[in-house]
């Protein structure tokens, strides 16, 4: 059995299929981890969603911001944006089944056998793995329950920007959701910044990548994530970023996680 992880699909299924053929992926024996953002901006969002869903237990995907945005559109609590490419999903005869499947995906997955943790964007420095798992569970429980339309409506916004155990209600769930699906930069005191999206080096002096904050409590937890195409392929600080900008005409990256030496492979995207 081999365990592979792949960066953001964002509706780009053809490059994924090329990578899986390259490694001779066998759904009966292997497992594919996806960092989230299965849909949007690319030309094959419906096909990508169906493909990953049909892999069953051979695929583990976490939710990204574009996935949650699609769910919000489906629920009627947010409008389709000009650059969205999700209309084929909204028009599909199996829309309800696909949305129900997507709504039940996790925000975090941890495999103790290989000691890797999968999430879409990042973790605030105040959280260790146990806290991250507990916070993910809080949002997942609501997302899978009767109040999920309200969560999908209330998740939009950048506040609060600082974690506190005393956070409650929708503000708490919004902060958790933002960290798992949108986070890139933090300040030294642990405040999160959702505005700047560029590569490290171009940010304001008080900002640093979430994984570079001194004293980060998740140090020692190996985390594979995506979301950050301007960062690109990055390995260091116990983290692995696999978003290499496929939807922007760059590359899609696949990594084998269960080998002693990390193996990565790429395919061009058009």
Curated annotation (Swiss-Prot):
Question: What domain of life is recorded for the organism?
Answer: Bacteria
Annotated Gene3D superfamilies: 3.60.21.10
Reaction catalyzed: P(1),P(4)-bis(5'-adenosyl) tetraphosphate + H2O = 2 ADP + 2 H(+)
EC number of the protein? 3.6.1.41
SUPFAM superfamilies on file: Metallo-dependent phosphatases
Which one of the record's GO molecular function terms can you name? bis(5'-nucleosyl)-tetraphosphatase (symmetrical) activity
Listed A to Z, the keywords are: Hydrolase
The EC category is hydrolase
Q: Which InterPro entries match?
A: ApaH, Calcineurin-like_PHP_ApaH, Metallo-depent_PP-like
NCBIfam families, alphabetically?
apaH (TIGR00668), PRK00166.1 (NF001204)
Q: What does this protein do?
A: Hydrolyzes diadenosine 5',5'''-P1,P4-tetraphosphate to yield ADP.
The entry assigns this protein to a family as follows: Belongs to the Ap4A hydrolase family.
The name under which this protein is listed is: Bis(5'-nucleosyl)-tetraphosphatase, symmetrical
Q: Which organism is it from?
A: Thioalkalivibrio sulfidiphilus (strain HL-EbGR7)
